[in-house]
């Protein structure tokens, strides 16, 4: 296993993140990168069906741990590259805790104390938080276009997943917003710092998954105690979450974050509750009524609009997407 070259500078606002230029992988343009990155939140949308149908109840942190730590160790073995220098060891730890170590427990608390639809809608606030953070951390101009479609996307997700009997537990709401804020800050810092030169997306994801998994290890056993027995269906579920929802998804996600505009990537998280709703209809026999279909269309429109530059104003200056 080798160590990565050191990187002393940070990614300049508006510049391509270190080690992530589009021509290097031969994909040729932003659309293939966007489609590959979208696989990540789409696979995260399977988490709800896998959890309810395959995993033992009452152990969401254990599921998060198995989603992160084994995937991180596998990615490290494949990438065979460790951080070099105290700066990147520290950055890998910070990003791992923000993107995974804090996000997963917050999600678990929100899912436990709120109806799934409310929790999903709070998570859909992430594009708005990223748009605000990008102005402070990346020095990007705050775009009314991004904000408007971020609100539209959150509203669309709410129409899809929130039922008339939804309850609003304050602790659950705080946890849901904490999850969105934690991952939004992690996403923004990932874009700010980029990847060190010579480090591929698999190794980069491995650093963060391992750091987040190690953070989750004591938290899980303190909060949930002894792990549950794992039968055949649970084994299938944990393997899916680890290899697909963990390893594959986060490699593609972090790859996209260092090769695409951060606000464009952030809005892709809206795919997660939409995929969950589709699987609920197909696998669990749930129905999507007219209001939900309208919300579905609104959220999809927000995802597409989030990949486009803001319309030019009448005089000719760009909107600054």
Residue ranges and their predicted role:
Residues 62-73, 107-141, 146-150, 179, ...:
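Specific alpha-helical transmembrane segments that line the substrate/conduction pathway
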Residues 54, 63, 67, 110, ...:
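Hydrophobic/aromatic residues within transmembrane alpha-helices
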Residues 64-66, 119-125, 189-213, 246-282, ...:
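Helix-helix packing/entry segments at the starts of transmembrane helices
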Residues 49, 71-75, 130-131, 150, ...:
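Transmembrane alpha-helical segments that form core, pore/gating elements
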């Amino acid at each position: 296993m080798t160590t990565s070259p050191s990187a002393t500078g940070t990614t300049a606002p508006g510049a391509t993140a270190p080690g992530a230029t589009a021509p290097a992988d031969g994909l040729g343009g932003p659309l293939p990168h966007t489609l590959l990155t979208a696989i990540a939140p789409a696979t995260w949308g399977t988490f709800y069906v896998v959890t309810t149908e395959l995993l033992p109840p009452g152990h969401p942190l254990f599921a998060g741990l198995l989603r992160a730590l084994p995937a991180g160790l596998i990615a490290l073995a494949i990438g065979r590259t460790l951080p070099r220098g105290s700066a990147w060891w520290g950055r890998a730890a910070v990003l791992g805790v923000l993107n995974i170590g804090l996000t997963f427990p917050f999600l678990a608390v929100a899912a436990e104390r709120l109806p799934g639809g409310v929790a999903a809608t709070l998570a859909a606030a992430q594009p708005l938080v990223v748009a605000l953070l990008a102005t402070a951390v990346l020095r990007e101009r705050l775009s009314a276009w991004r904000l408007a479609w971020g609100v539209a996307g959150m509203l669309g997700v709410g129409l899809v997943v929130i039922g008339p009997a939804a309850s609003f537990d304050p602790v659950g709401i705080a946890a849901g917003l904490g999850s969105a804020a934690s991952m939004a800050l992690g996403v923004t810092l990932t874009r700010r710092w980029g990847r060190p030169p010579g480090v591929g997306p698999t190794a980069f994801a491995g650093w963060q998954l391992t750091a987040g998994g190690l953070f989750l290890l004591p938290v899980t056993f303190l909060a949930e105690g002894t792990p549950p027995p794992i039968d055949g269906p649970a084994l299938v579920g944990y393997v899916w979450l680890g290899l697909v929802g963990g390893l594959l998804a986060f490699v593609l996600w972090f790859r996209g974050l260092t090769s695409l505009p951060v606000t464009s990537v952030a809005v892709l998280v809206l795919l997660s509750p939409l995929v969950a709703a589709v699987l609920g209809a197909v696998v669990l026999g749930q129905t999507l009524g007219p209001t939900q279909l309208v919300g579905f269309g609104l959220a999809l429109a927000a995802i597409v609009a989030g990949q486009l530059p803001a319309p030019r104003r009448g005089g000719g200056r760009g909107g600054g997407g």
